[in-house]
Regions:
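Conserved ATP-binding subdomain of kinase catalytic cores across diverse folds
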Residues: 1-89
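Conserved kinase catalytic-core segment
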Residues: 17-36, 91-155
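A glycine-rich phosphate-binding loop feature that marks nucleotide/adenosyl-phosphate handling sites
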Residues: 48-53, 117, 132-139, 198-200, ...
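A short beta-strand motif that forms the metal-chelation/ATP-contact edge
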Residues: 53-59, 146, 204-211
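Catalytic-core segments of enzymes that bind and process phosphorylated/nucleotide-bearing substrates
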Residues: 75, 79, 83-92, 137-192
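Regulatory N- and C-terminal appendages and interdomain linkers associated
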Residues: 141-142, 205-250
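Long, amphipathic alpha-helical stalk/connector segments used for oligomerization, subunit docking
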Residues: 195-200, 218
C-alpha cells in the first residue's frame, strides 16, 4: 500500500516466474480500456529494486478534510449470492438482471458492463471472475465501481473461455457470444455491433502509443499483438464488418 497526499495506491510487483511482462501488460490493457471510454481505475507504472511495479489508485477510499473515508463495496460474487465453490456459475446475464432492479442508473450501467465484457474478450482477459467485478453500496442501492484487474492472460491456443458465463451456458471468448447476450444489456444488435466497432478502432489507434508509454519490450508487444489483443479466434461467427476492421492490425 502506498499513500500520497490525495490518494492511496495498491502496488503490484513483477515476478521472476512471469513468462511475459504481466505488470506492463496489465497497464497497457487498463490504459486501452480507459481510452476506449470505459470507467477504469487510474493506473501508473513505476519501478522498485529493479522490478516493474503497477500502481492502482484505490477507489474505495475517499480523501476528506478528516482523512480517508472508506466506501462500502461488494463483489459481484456476493451480489450473485455465490461462494467460492459456486463461482463457476457466475454469469454476466444474471448480473445484468440484478443491475436492472437494484442499481442506480441501470441502463447506462448495463451499457458499461457490456462494454467491459466486450473489452475483456478483445484484450484476452479471461480472468474476469466474479471477484473482479464490484459495486459501491450506500445502504440502499448499488453503483458499479471502476473496472480493475484487466490483464491479458497467457493462452496456449486461439480458443479461450471467459471465467464468467456470458449468456446461458456459453462462456466462449467470442464477439458472437457477446452479441447474443446484448439484449440483456438493453442493446439491440446494431447498437452492440457499433459499440464493439468503436472499441476495436480505439484499440488499434492507441495500441502502439500505449505500449510506448509503458516502455514495453518489442517481444512482449508482439506477444500481445499476436496472441492476446484482437486474437483472430474471437471473431469467429462475428459480422464481417467487425472482422474487416482488424485486417491491418497484424
Amino acid at each position: 500500500m502506498i499513500e500520497t497526499p490525495a490518494h492511496k495506491w495498491i502496488a503490484k510487483f513483477s515476478s521472476s516466474s512471469d513468462t511475459f511482462n504481466v505488470v506492463k501488460s496489465e497497464f497497457v490493457a487498463m490504459r486501452l480500456a480507459a481510452l476506449a471510454g470505459l470507467d477504469v481505475a487510474v493506473v501508473q507504472l513505476t519501478a522498485a529494486a529493479g522490478r516493474d511495479v503497477l500502481l492502482i489508485q484505490r477507489f474505495d477510499r475517499q480523501h476528506t478534510a478528516d482523512g480517508y473515508q472508506r466506501r462500502a463495496m461488494v463483489s459481484a460474487l456476493t451480489i450473485l449470492e455465490l461462494d467460492e465453490l459456486m463461482a463457476r456459475y457466475a454469469s454476466y446475464e444474471t448480473l445484468a438482471e440484478i443491475v436492472r432492479h437494484r442499481f442506480d442508473a441501470p441502463v447506462p450501467t448495463l451499457h458499461e458492463l457490456f462494454g467491459r465484457l466486450v473489452f475483456n474478450v478483445l484484450c484476452g482477459n479471461t480472468d474476469d471472475h466474479a471477484r473482479n467485478h464490484a459495486a459501491f453500496w450506500n445502504g440502499s442501492s448499488l453503483a458499479l465501481t471502476p473496472a480493475y484487474d484487466i490483464c491479458p492472460q497467457a493462452r496456449a491456443g486461439n480458443e479461450a473461455s471467459q471465467a464468467m458465463l456470458i449468456v446461458g451456458q456459453q462462456r466462449s471468448s467470442r464477439l458472437a457470444t457477446c452479441l447474443q447476450a446484448a439484449p440483456h444489456f438493453v442493446l439491440d444488435d446494431a447498437a452492440a455491433t457499433a459499440l464493439i466497432a468503436r472499441q476495436i478502432t480505439s484499440i488499434q489507434q492507441h495500441f502502439d502509443a500505449v505500449c510506448q508509454e509503458a516502455n514495453l519490450a518489442e517481444v512482449d508487444r508482439n506477444l500481445l499483438r499476436v496472441r492476446n489483443i484482437l486474437n483472430p479466434a474471437i471473431f469467429e461467427g462475428a459480422p464481417d464488418a467487425l472482422q474487416r476492421l482488424v485486417a491491418g492490425f497484424r
